[in-house]
């Protein structure tokens, strides 16, 4: 065991990295994936990742709710965050073409972190989703990706309002109050 992992905590972190790697492996096997838009690539990633998470749902939820301290549980995603941010940088297009290197780095960081926050919000929604076949998580993914890309790359449109209505409805149904 110690030849591969320094601790059980590291093993838990590596579990999520392995899920990430397998998700990308599955996506890479899809011949059309490389021709997808950034939004479609991100959606495909989320759908595939959460399909895999669903296959191991009890274990994943156990890992992320094991400790009473939510920050300690979130720490189990630290290695996943590292690889996810690299992935996000490769697929997300810059909304504004800027020549100044410092500003480009800031823009890249903002895009990466916003994408990570979106991923965490989907993760949290999925953990609390009690709908059949986690259909509401699928809707959450669709609406949040559409709204975030509209906000970043276009003038916010109906998708932002649509996503807001969905969130409001789920808040009223108690989806976000569970933890």
Place the predicted regions along the sequence by residue.
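Short glycine/serine- and small hydrophobic-enriched flexible loop segments
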Residues: 121-128
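Hydrophobic/aromatic residues within well-ordered alpha-helical segments
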Residues: 15, 19, 23, 45, ...
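All-alpha amphipathic helical-bundle segments outside canonical DNA-binding/catalytic cores
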Residues: 98-114, 134-139
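Helical hydrophobic small-molecule/effector-binding pocket
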Residues: 40-64, 79-93
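C-terminal peripheral helix-coil segments that are non-catalytic and often amphipathic
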Residues: 128-179
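Amphipathic alpha-helical packing segments from all-alpha helical-bundle domains
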Residues: 73-97, 109-121
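Short acidic alpha-helical/loop segments enriched in Asp/Glu that coordinate divalent cations
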Residues: 60-75, 102-103
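An amphipathic alpha-helix adjacent to DNA-recognition modules
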Residues: 2-28, 32, 43-50
């Amino acid at each position: 065991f110690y030849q591969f992992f320094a601790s059980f905590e590291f093993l838990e972190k590596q579990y999520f990295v392995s899920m990430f790697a397998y998700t990308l492996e599955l996506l890479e096997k899809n011949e059309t994936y490389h021709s997808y838009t950034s939004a479609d690539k991100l959606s495909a990633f989320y759908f595939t990742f959460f399909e895999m998470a669903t296959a191991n749902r009890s274990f994943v939820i156990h890992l992320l709710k094991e400790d009473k301290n939510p920050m300690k549980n979130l720490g189990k995603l630290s290695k996943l965050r590292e690889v996810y941010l690299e992935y996000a940088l490769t697929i997300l297009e810059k909304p504004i073409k800027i020549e100044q290197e410092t500003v480009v780095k800031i823009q890249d960081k903002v895009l990466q972190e916003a994408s990570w926050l979106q991923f965490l919000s989907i993760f949290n929604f999925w953990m609390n989703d009690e709908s059949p076949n986690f259909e509401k998580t699928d809707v959450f993914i669709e609406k949040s990706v559409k709204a975030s890309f509209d906000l970043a790359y276009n003038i916010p449109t109906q998708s932002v309002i649509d996503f807001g209505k969905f969130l409001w409805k789920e808040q009223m149904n108690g989806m976000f109050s569970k933890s």
